[in-house]
Curated annotation (Swiss-Prot):
One of its GO terms (molecular function) is DNA binding. Protein, which is both involved in DNA repair and protein ubiquitination, as part of the UV-DDB complex and DCX (DDB1-CUL4-X-box) complexes, respectively. Core component of the UV-DDB complex (UV-damaged DNA-binding protein complex), a complex that recognizes UV-induced DNA damage and recruit proteins of the nucleotide excision repair pathway (the NER pathway) to initiate DNA repair. The UV-DDB complex preferentially binds to cyclobutane pyrimidine dimers (CPD), 6-4 photoproducts (6-4 PP), apurinic sites and short mismatches. It comes from Drosophila melanogaster (Fruit fly). Disruption phenotype: Reduced tissue growth in the wing imaginal disk. This is DNA damage-binding protein 1.
Length: 1140
């Protein structure tokens, strides 16, 4: 049996619907946004959008509409899911908390209906009498509205129109009247139907208009008293009300398809239109008073400016509108009354959207065991790379350019009673600089008692309103009030101070092997004891373990030569415990600290690794030794307080915050490239902040409370499709699609983008034959015709600058990409597969595999081989090129002559779209035949089919979990796991890949990659997870699939079953129903997968509900079976959350 845990690390970001209404109260103006299975409710305020609530739906949202019942003063929400579940939602205030309740729900599916080719469409009558839906061909589904009904019951009305593109209800009609755009053999037509709600049937055709524009796809109903409908086509706009007809054909419309609209004015005279080019238009209806009332006399359209490619638009208020997008970032924009640089559109805020994620690369650029995800996100002009890593963010408030800092401390100087620090001391080689913080101003100053001509080793406020400065020469005690030197201690002889540590009452100084213990008194420094150790001191610490005490009874010392940590007692400096640190790397920083009442000793080494121990406060004994790798450079440990808890900041090339959760240490990366020095700063202008120094500057900022995903955008201006990483050249290769327009002088890019602005640009020689006489190539394109131009971009791994762009001549397209080391060749190559896509051909007949070498800022084509058809997938396979070409899987070897020679192939697929390899085994994902496992017999030079999944599935991605277990995703948003049965007794059983686990994710996975978002092997983990596979989806979600053992699965499954009963979903769709594995009419229960999103919701429950959820649960702890209590389960679930 195969057991897996699947959880979302990044929720879906693509917006599928948005609307504005009075949902939470009659006076609240709400923006409501739907993303896949989530609804976000925001409040529109003068300051901007304020999130109020986020709700999860156990279903994939297909349509979201709002309406206002006749007897209500606020709006209700109607949602239709992909599985035809319907619900009406209402917001209510319960104990001053907004609660979304399900007023009515139901399922409107039909077991014999043929799904509509135009997709799922729904509309609501303006008087809220009926909801109408086009779900199946030839049927119009209605739900009559009954305010007292809790169940939504549907009736199907027979409809002559089969191919329906849009449906709306007309305003101002006595009976509900629906209008449709449909298509038949004669063209596209608009027709209206009046509905008899009592008999639940169509009464008559109110009016119709035959032969509208052949590409008309959208209807806009016009409110009363004007009435009628606006028909939006590719080239024209028509207004029609049955008798009155007006049309306009704006020239700019021909460039792209209008796909969404928003009504601006309640009288229905102004509408915003958005198209697939990301252009925003305003449509004006001109009216006139006649004997029949107000009628439309003309239509005007004005182009306003550029926006993200919209999926939906809603007008908020006062010239603000929200652009919901699924190809790029969603936006809040403002419309200006005057044009600025030809545009009336002013972007106000962008909302990150990763969708659609077509490919991902998981890289560990810093070699820290922590994955950084680079996604190919977005489409067309909104395409980008997104750099995603998990960590703790620093919110930067100020930056001071100061290179060469060797140490940094914050002080409170002067007699001011203010609790705030006002001084920053910066140490440099050979001198010290002092900065005064006055508000947000930073000025250089002096403290007369400090030795400014020497490098400071340590600085601190100490008892009796005094300051300490330690240099290589001496320890200086300075009055905070007068800033004058009041006492000084110097080491005897010609010794110089090398290492120092202090608290508010004690100082510990080391010079080579000698240690001096000094007590701070009022106006004096008293040396109390000294001792010579066997080896030279590398680092030391005198921090009190008890936070309520000012002085410490213990000293921690790190020694050279024998590489050890030594605990000394005070005041006599006697050795009470010695811990040998294995290896030859010296300790560079040592720290005693207390987390959640447990005392620890942390000891960081010169190679970026760190040992940590539990420490006995009385005996100094160190136990429970553990080691983690935090960076690659020497690490300095400093404490700071955040939210009244102690934390440790590890300064290095990979800065890390160390804290404790449930009595376990947690190590979280900080999203800064490098931090050499750090100190707490609580200044008036920068309260509860940190000062962080790198080699060039000081950053003043605040630290996030929790670790989370941090996303950086690299805009490309064209659509990225595939990505590969090459460590040897420190570059990424990205294949992109750019849209050019054919003009009189040839093809021209529509806009500047990554491929047009690269440092170097080359163009492919189009050696390929031109089928059909070449009449489809770019050279013979018509003026104004759009041309797909594919590019290979080489991008620097650190700066993400486009170093080289290689353009392929249309109609040659890039279908696959990888980086590979081939044969005995010392070079690493980029391997690119292309195909010739001719519109007149059902599928490409010819393509090529090209070998590129990037070296010394030059991209050189080394070799190429012609292939028959499209190469959908490339994989490096034991130093060879494995390719899925049409229905073949082929293996090419790299010869000494730098040529690709086909070694073997196998043909038993419809289309080999996806390939993964491990050892001699190859996993093939087929277009519609699920997955097949092949083995390469090296001695015979052949492929052999080992086993296959005989259940047909339209595949989207595959991955090898281990030698016998294989993960797949298919087009209906399902995940499944098949397992090879090596112990099978018959050949027939051995040739099958039985499906052992299945799960409905509710989103289509496009790519799987092995890797982790968090640092591996860091800290203590109680959850027995094995391996980690990341996935990216169409809707911009990133998730994790990991394997778990049987007993842990049983425990989590028990918790999952209890949570299903305790957590009531909005919309009343059962969790079990939602996660059912469904392909067309075939439905199977979810099995072998644990829903991590549901498990993690345990942490959001009240304590009473937590107790209910764990009642009767048993778990195994330290080899013993016991009844689970709330604390046990909290620890386990929190541990699971640390995967992301």
């Amino acid at each position: 049996m195969s057991h897996h845990y699947v959880v979302t690390a990044q929720k879906p970001t693509a917006v599928v619907a948005c609307l504005t209404g009075n949902f939470t109260s009659p006076t609240d103006l709400n923006l409501i946004i739907a993303r896949n299975n989530q609804v976000e409710i925001d409040l529109v305020t003068p300051e901007g959008l304020r999130p109020l609530k986020e709700i999860n739906i156990n279903g994939t949202i297909a349509v979201m509409r709002h309406f206002r019942p006749p007897d209500s003063n606020k709006d209700l929400l109607f949602i239709l899911t992909r599985r035809y579940n319907v619900m009406i939602l209402e917001a209510r205030m319960v104990n001053d908390v907004i609660t979304v309740v399900t007023k009515a729900n139901g399922n409107v599916s039909d077991s014999v209906g043929i799904p509509s080719e135009g997709g799922v469409i729904a509309a609501i009558d303006p008087k809220a009498r009926v909801i109408g839906m086009c779900l199946y061909q030839g049927l119009f589904t209605i739900i009559p509205m009954d305010k007292d009904a809790s169940e939504l019951k549907a009736t199907n009305l027979r409809m002559d129109e089969l191919n329906v593109y849009d449906v709306e209800f007309l305003h101002g009609c006595l009976n509900p009247t629906v209008i449709v755009i449909h298509k038949d053999s004669d063209g596209r037509h608009v027709k209206s139907h009046e509905i008899n709600l009592r008999d639940k049937e169509f009464m008559k055709i109110a009016w119709k208009q035959d032969n509208v524009e052949t590409e008309a796809t959208m209807l806009i109903p016009v409110p009363s008293p004007i009435g009628g409908v606006i028909v939006i086509g590719r080239e024209s706009i028509v207004y029609h009300d049955g008798s009155n007809y007006h049309a306009v054909a704006p020239l700019t419309f021909r460039q792209s398809t209008i796909n969404c609209y928003a009504r601006v004015s309640s009288n229905g005279l102004r509408y915003l239109l958005g198209n697939m080019d990301g252009q925003l238009y305003m449509l004006f209806l001109g009216t006139a008073e006649t004997s029949k009332g107000v009628t439309v006399k003309d239509i005007k359209v004005e182009q306003l400016g550029e926006i993200s490619i919209p999926e939906c638009i809603t007008y908020l208020d006062n010239g603000f509108l929200y652009i919901g997008a699924r190809h790029g970032d969603s936006q809040l924009v403002r419309l200006n009354s005057e044009a600025i640089d030809g545009s009336y559109v002013v972007p106000v805020e962008n909302f990150t959207n990763l969708a659609p994620i077509l490919d991902i690369a998981v890289v560990d650029l810093d070699r820290q065991g922590q994955g950084q995800i680079i996604t190919c996100s977005g489409s067309f002009k909104d395409g980008s790379l997104r750099i995603i890593r998990i960590g703790i963010g620093i919110q930067e408030h100020a930056c001071i350019d100061l290179p060469g800092i060797k140490g940094m401390w914050s002080l409170k100087v002067g007699v001011d009673e203010s609790p705030y620090e006002n001084t920053l001391v910066l140490a440099f080689v050979g001198h010290t600089r002092i900065l005064t913080l006055s508000g947000e101003e930073v000025e250089e100053t002096e403290i007369p008692g400090f030795a400014s001509d020497l490098q400071t080793f340590l600085c601190s406020n100490v008892d009796y309103d005094q300051l300490i400065q330690v240099t290589s020469d001496s320890v200086r005690l300075v009055s905070s009030a007068t800033k004058a030197l009041v006492a000084e201690w110097r080491p005897t002889g010609d010794r110089t101070i090398g290492v120092v540590s202090c608290n508010t009452t004690q100082i510990l100084v080391a010079s080579a092997c000698d240690i001096f213990y000094i007590v701070i008194e009022d106006g004096s420094l008293r040396e109390q004891s000294r001792r010579t150790l066997a080896y030279e001191v590398a680092c030391l610490d005198i921090t009190p373990l008890d936070e309520t005490q000012k002085k410490s009874d213990l000293v921690a010392v790190g020694l050279w030569t024998d590489i050890s940590a030594v605990i000394l007692s005070l005041p006599d400096l006697e050795t009470i415990y010695t811990e040998k640190l294995s290896g030859e790397i010296i300790p560079r920083s040592i720290l005693m600290t207390t987390f959640e009442g447990i005392h620890y000793l942390l000891c960081a080494l010169g190679d970026g690794s760190m040992y940590y121990f539990i420490m006995d406060q009385t005996t100094g004994q160190l136990t429970d030794k553990k080691k983690v790798t935090l960076g690659t450079q020497p690490t300095t440990l400093r404490t700071f307080r955040s939210l009244s808890t102690t934390n440790v900041f590890a300064c290095s090339d990979r800065p890390t915050v160390i804290y404790s959760s449930n009595h376990k240490l947690v190590f979280s990366n900080v999203n800064l490239k490098e931090v050499n020095h750090m100190c707490s700063l609580n200044a008036q202008a920068y309260p509860d902040s940190l000062a962080l120094a790198n080699k060039n500057a000081v950053i003043l900022g605040t630290i996030d409370e929790i670790q989370k995903l941090h996303i950086r955008t690299v805009p490309l201006g064209e659509g990225p499709r595939r990505i590969a990483y090459q460590e040897s050249s420190q570059t990424f290769a990205v294949s992109t699609l750019r849209i050019d327009v054919h003009g009189r002088g040839g093809a021209k890019p529509l806009r500047n983008s990554a491929s047009t602005q690269a440092q170097n640009i080359t163009c492919s020689s189009n050696f390929l034959p031109k089928p059909g006489g070449g009449n489809s190539t770019a050279a013979n394109a018509e003026v104004g015709q759009e041309i797909d131009v594919h590019n290979l971009l080489v991008i620097d791994q650190n700066t993400f600058e486009v170093l080289h762009a290689h353009q392929f001549v249309a109609p040659e397209t890039i279908s696959s990409l990888m980086s590979a080391k081939l044969g005995d060749d010392p070079n690493t190559y980029y391997v690119v597969a292309t195909s010739l896509v001719i519109p007149e051909e059902p599928e490409p007949k010819v393509g090529r595999i090209i070998i590129f070498h990037y070296h010394e800022n030059k991209l050189t084509q080394v070799a190429e081989t012609k292939v028959d058809g499209t190469c959908y997938a490339l994989v490096e396979f034991n130093g060879k090129v494995l390719a899925g070409i049409g229905s073949f899987v082929r293996l090419y070897e790299w010869t000494n002559e730098k040529e690709l020679r086909m070694e073997c192939n196998i043909q038993n697929m419809i289309a080999a779209l996806f390939l993964k390899a491990k050892g001699d085994f190859i996993l093939v994902g087929d277009l519609m035949r699920s997955i097949t496992l092949l083995q390469h017999k090296q001695m015979e030079g052949i492929f052999v089919e080992i086993a296959r999944d005989c259940e047909p599935k339209w595949m989207r991605a595959v991955e090898i979990l281990d030698d016998d277990t294989f993960l797949g995703s298919e087009t209906n948003g399902n995940l499944f796991v098949c397992q090879k049965d090596s112990a099978a007794t018959t050949d027939e059983e051995r040739q099958l890949l039985p499906e052992l686990a299945r799960f409905h994710l509710g989103d289509t996975v496009n790519v799987f990659r092995h890797g982790s978002l968090v640092m591996q092997n860091v800290g203590e983990r109680t959850t027995p997870i094995n391996g980690c596979v990341l996935y990216g989806t169409c809707n911009g979600a990133i998730g994790i699939v990991t394997q778990i053992p049987q007993d842990f699965y049983d425990f989590l499954h028990g918790l999952e079953e209890r949570l299903k009963k305790i957590i009531k979903s909005v919309g009343k769709i059962e969790h079990t129903y939602y996660r059912n594995f469904q392909i067309n009419s075939k439905v199977e229960p979810s099995e072998g997968f644990i829903d991590g999103d549901l498990i993690e919701s345990f942490l959001d429950l009240s304590r009473d509900k937590m107790r209910d959820a764990v009642q009767g649960l048993e778990l195994t702890l330290n080899g013993e079976r016991k009844s689970a209590d709330v604390e046990d389960v909290i620890k386990i679930v929190e541990d699971l959350t640390r995967m992301h």
